[in-house]
From Swiss-Prot:
Entry GO MF terms: alpha-L-fucosidase activity
Family the UniProt entry places it in: Belongs to the glycosyl hydrolase 29 family.
InterPro entries reported in the protein's UniProt record: FUC_metazoa-typ, Fucosidase_C, Glyco_hydro_29, Glyco_hydro_29_CS, Glyco_hydro_b, Glycoside_hydrolase_SF
Protein's UniProt name: Plasma alpha-L-fucosidase
The encoding gene: FUCA2
UniProt EC number: 3.2.1.51
Modified residues (Phosphoserine): 301
Length: 467
């Protein structure tokens, strides 16, 4: 064989070898395929980012923000249940011929600035948001192809609210973008017809719900998909397992998306990604499954209420307590605000969000990316809650009341002589402590004036090398 022939022969041989090699491994997201059954879907591992995030912001906004009276269930309470205060409100403020649909053009969102919202959410210390893309009234905050003349492009704002907020969140913050979606609609004729057939007919999910869900995921790629409002229909009616199989296997967010447990009658607290179990769910003890406490700053409503007084809002102390209790017991806190019809975040909501952010700047180490500890709540000092970071050999004791004696008694941590160290987050200097005779330790807190305190509303001790 002549030397010049070698290159010509080498190429076919190399090609043959490449063809004989095994194919490269598939990307991680397609390594596991999920069947459209709860058994298969429930086995999906929740993306790690969600448990690490701990704190999110819920945003209830829609046409119900126009009357902004009583509740975001205004339409239902007025027209279906005919609750007197809602009926009287309409009689006193609107002409007799006024319909709920007439609120649509009044939902102007004229002061809505997605960048301002994003900056406030970033300042809150939250790690994800969830916006109501469609509530039970059926009005969509994007130009849904399946909600003719009852969406934010055709009516009211005449803007794609979902897109504007998605872009702002992803361009200006490190938060994950999520969407809430109501499966059913109170007064949609197709849903009512299906309901009258005991859900043997499936016109509504086939022509409305499922197409909109696919549209939302493909167009806006939410990393939280927060389902709600099954209308009493089972998951088979909604084809929830079929949709979730697509979401986990094929969708553009298949590797990072998290979902909740509201996918049909009987699924709540039983099937899905993380459990919500009920509104304002806060069990106060450890659960075996990842869960979320969705709750409201306004004690009585998810949507904005013009008649709310200052005592109707949770204080920052109460909100910090909710966060600490929830995270100590393995949950995430999803804290709700309700913007006005103009698209502004009211001063009281903004203040609470910024206060949470200032608290988390000091104490976030004891919240973000933490794990539950062997004890959640101290028995000697009940206002103490625990989190941990096992790899760093850290336990955090978050206490909500500063003891007047300057001594904090902790009944659960056991010190290791010569190894244990205690620090107050935001203070830095190691603190003196002594072991108690039975169990636990007593920590000598630093003597600080109110202006020297690293934060208000709650404090955290970092305990290194305790058992």
């Amino acid at each position: 064989m002549r030397p010049q022939e070698l290159p010509r022969l080498a190429f076919p041989l190399l090609l043959l070898l490449l063809l004989l090699l095994p194919p490269p491994p598939c990307p991680a997201h397609s390594a596991t395929r999920f069947d459209p059954t709860w058994e298969s879907l429930d086995a999906r591992q929740l993306p790690a980012w969600f448990d690490q995030a701990k704190f999110g912001i819920f945003i209830h906004w829609g046409v119900f923000s126009v009357p902004s009276f009583g509740s975001e269930w205004f339409w239902w309470y007025w027209q279906k249940e005919k609750i007197p205060k809602y009926v009287e409100f309409m009689k006193d403020n609107y002409p007799p011929s006024f319909k709920y649909e007439d609120f649509g053009p009044l939902f102007t969102a004229k002061f809505f600035n997605a960048n301002q919202w994003a900056d406030i959410f970033q300042a809150s210390g939250a790690k994800y948001i969830v916006l109501t893309s469609k509530h039970h009234e059926g009005f969509t905050l994007w130009g849904s192809e399946y909600s003719w003349n009852w969406n934010a492009i055709d009516e009211g704002p005449k803007r794609d609210i979902v897109k504007e907020l998605e872009v702002a969140i992803r361009n200006r913050t490190d938060l994950r973008f999520g969407l809430y979606y109501s499966l059913f609609e109170w007064f949609h004729p197709l849903f009512l017809e299906d309901e009258s057939s005991s859900f043997h007919k499936r016109q509504f999910p086939v022509s409305k719900t499922l197409p909109e869900l696919y549209e939302l995921v493909n167009n806006y790629q939410p990393e939280v998909l927060w389902s709600d409002g099954d209308g009493g229909a089972p998951d088979q009616y909604w084809n929830s397992t079929g949709f979730l199989a697509w979401l986990y296997n094929e969708s553009p967010v298949r590797g990072t998306v998290v979902t909740n447990d509201r996918w049909g009658a009987g699924s709540i607290c039983k099937h899905g990604g993380f459990y919500t179990c009920s509104d304002r769910y806060n069990p106060g003890h450890l659960l075996p499954h990842k869960w979320e406490n969705c709750m409201t700053i306004d004690k009585l409503s998810w949507g904005y209420r013009r008649e709310a007084g200052i005592s109707d809002y949770l204080t920052i102390e109460e909100l910090v307590k909710q966060l600490v209790e929830t995270v100590s017991c393995g949950g995430n806190l999803l804290m709700n605000i309700g913007p006005t019809l103009d698209g502004t975040i009211s001063v009281v909501f903004e203040e609470r969000l910024r206060q949470m952010g200032s608290w988390l700047k000091v104490n976030g180490e004891a919240i973000y990316e933490t794990h539950t500890w062997r004890s959640q709540n101290d028995t000697v000092t009940p206002d103490v809650w625990y989190t941990s970071k096992p790899k760093e050999k850290l336990v955090y004791a978050i206490f909500l009341k500063w003891p007047t004696s300057g001594q904090l008694f902790l009944g659960h941590p056991k010190a290791i002589l010569g190894a244990t160290e205690v620090k107050l987050l935001g203070h830095g200097q190691p603190l003196n402590w002594i072991s108690l005779e039975q169990n636990g330790i007593m920590v000598e807190l630093p003597q600080l004036t109110i202006h020297q305190m690293p934060c208000k509303w709650g404090w955290a001790l970092a305990l290194t090398n305790v058992i």
